Amino acid sequence: MRAVIFGASGLLGRRMVRAFGDMTVTGTGFSRTAGALVAVDATSADAIARLLGRERPDIVVNCVGERRPAVWAGEPDRARAGNVDAARLIAKGARRCGARLVHISSDYVFDGMAPPYQPDSLPNPLNAYGRWKLTAEHAVRAACPDAAILRLPVLYGPVRFAAETNLTEIAHQVAAGAPVQLDDVCVRYPTHADEAAEVCRRLAEVLVKGKHLGSVAHWSAEQGLTKYQMAHLIARRFDLPAGHLRAGEADAAAGDRPVDARLDCHDLLAALGPVRHRLFDIEFPAVVEPWLTPAAPVRGRRKDRA
Ligand SMILES: NC(=O)c1ccc[n+]([C@@H]2O[C@H](COP(=O)([O-])OP(=O)(O)OC[C@H]3O[C@@H](n4cnc5c(N)ncnc54)[C@H](OP(=O)(O)O)[C@@H]3O)[C@@H](O)[C@H]2O)c1
């Protein structure tokens, strides 16, 4: 079996390549193409067609996205291209080469006012990122009607710079010791990128066997936490001072972040069978520990969505 993972240089894509490691897997990057990654501009239909024509995959996974708030605000054309145009072109390419497609989307398509959200709940994105993710879903469905759209909540996992995820950025703030206010209203469901990748792998298997699930699937960890609660968990686990941490409501007050966009996963669980949930309390220490030193690099090329 052959798989192509678009966006394999990113947080999720890197774990996806591992999860599909028993297949012949080709990963693409754009600005980061170290190792075996192939450089592909996903806003170029020709570049996508060339790659898919060469690799002839059974399954395509699209992890391309532009989730940096600085780009939504400052370079909307680029953010739209990375989120919407790339999604449409990859979906067209997958259909043309006869591969099944899993397209990664986000819980930010919901407004967070009435959780839990089912795959057929009415989306109502609050910010540009959520609107782009929703527009991308529509484009994918039109271009490749049998694609599976997998919506995920905020992810954590091994990172290359602290700001690559909310969790590692918060860990850095806890360790830095400077006064910091963290939102204590919006509830997130941090999900390990390896768990998301494993679910995607299982979903891909089901699709390749020719099964047709609903076009949208949800996956999420079960434990809900605010950023402030995550900070306290980190401080407690590593015996760090917590007096500089203040509970705030910045994300909620801004009005463009869902307060609670919990995704209901029962449909996908029924289709896949038992899936091992990775428990946040058990997983987070290994992920944050390397970032608890003030010397660790905070910013890399990419900045996490808020
Ligand atoms: N991270 C989260 O918390 C989260 C939560 C829910 C859903 N998602 C969704 O999951 C997907 C993956 O997210 P992520 O966190 O892994 O993102 P990420 O770390 O920012 O990685 C994004 C990937 O997209 C690639 N890319 C961006 N523009 C491209 C272009 N024009 N052509 C080709 N590749 C391009 C990047 O390549 P280079 O870096 O090499 O340029 C990178 O491989 C996205 O759809 C995102 O919206 C993420």
Identify the residue ranges that each predicted region occupies.
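NAD(P)-dependent short-chain dehydrogenase/reductase
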Residues: 141-188, 195, 201-202
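Mid/C-terminal beta-alpha module of Rossmann-like enzyme folds, strongest
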Residues: 197-253, 295-302
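Rossmann-fold cofactor-recognition segment
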Residues: 30-46
